[in-house]
Amino acid sequence: ALAYEGNTDLIDDKLNTTRSIDDIFKSAQRVFNTWSKWNPADRTTENLLRMLDFDFFEVLDSVTIARSRKHIQKYYDTAEIGTFPTRLKPISLRPPLTNLKQAINYNEIFELLMLLSLTIYTPSHFILPSKMDKYAELYEDNKVNIGFTQANREQGIRRLTAINLMKRMESSVYSFNLTLKRILELIESTIHSIDTYDKKSSVKLELTDISNVDEFDSEDQNDEELFAFGKKVKIEIGDMDYKSWRDSLVKDRDVLELLILMVGDITPEYDSKLQELFRVIKNKLEHPINEGNKKIIIFTAFADTAGYLYDNVSKFVKDKFHLNTAMVSGSVEGRTTVPKLHSDLNTVLTCFSPISKDKYLLMPDDKTEIDLLIATDCISEGQNLQDCDYLINYDIHWNPVRIIQRFGRIDRIGSKNTYIQLVNFWADVTLDDYIDL
């Protein structure tokens, strides 16, 4: 279906045609109906093309036509263009957080996270009533982003941070721990600012915007509008009920310190999810689903997790199987275990999927090959990586469309693989608990 929402003016204005798109399609349909009644000798593609007018071809040149897997299988000669690989039943894995005895689990972490107020992200809630008009004038009447008051923006950041914490917990202990430490550092520096003001009341201090946008991975952040306003907001501590704010910050600090302490013992050797990933990789390499194919893609939503996986997985596959690994991310520089190989996106993907990327043309003298690719969603769209037959979602993206897009990197017509496999890692919680998360 064409995405012009029933309003043909939306697309007519963008097309270089003499008639509306509705008229063009009606005319094309009449031509087709006439052509389809001709005898077989005259009912040729050449005759049909001659009957269609210029406007119809202008439309075809101006739009992208999406075809589903079923549509292609039904209407196209797959013997000529190739077939789709057979999708094996997806594998779902739910490893525990750790195999350490009496260690914290997902549900216990969730309960502690529910204790966080995250008021570090809502300083405007503590502005004294007598000072509210001052900040309403400064920020809420700002015309740059009508509808986003500073208080609303802060509340949005607080909620996003809470969701971000939970998704990072699900992604990896390492990523979760990093985020806890970053928020703790922010809280401690703010408490220090308050204490400094409290002890030296003659010193005029201002709090600039404390939201840390970098905490969200750029390839995942779809809430740019939320962060576009208020970057230079300043609230004088003297205009706040800073004692109440400090009390709230201290409570969050104590919870964060407890969480950091409890997850700190979960090092890679005790990270059950990572160890399960090693098992999955080992099984795939020792028992390939397509003869001789060792290639694996591991997707994660977070650059921190991608780096953690690269540090551990690359060593594992190099030591055990003498294979090369690479990592690509939209927010950090790529990495690879291949000596002297440029780790830019195009080079890495060409070495990972040499057939689909025509490596023999681009790098004819290079025999380098990468068998394991760790990636964020910077490559979840638009990349043909059909040399690979095995895709692992190390975490589940909040947007289900991304999961489909990820698998689409290897589920492609003309694939040399007979079978393809999807593996999903889920948090070790019940369905009801997961919905709550």
Feature locations, PLM:
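Inter-lobe coupling linker of SF2 helicases/translocases
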Residues: 2-210, 436-437
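Conserved strand-helix element at the start of the C-terminal RecA-like helicase core
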Residues: 165, 172, 176, 292-310
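Conserved interdomain hinge at the start of the Helicase C-terminal
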Residues: 268-301
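Conserved helicase motor "Helicase C" RecA-like lobe of SF1/SF2 P-loop NTPases
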Residues: 303-329
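Conserved helicase ATPase core of P-loop NTP-dependent helicases/translocases
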Residues: 332-375
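SF2 helicase motor core recognition
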Residues: 360-367, 374-388, 408-413
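A short beta-strand element within the Helicase C-terminal
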Residues: 384-395, 421-424
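A conserved SF2-helicase RecA2
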Residues: 401-407, 411-437
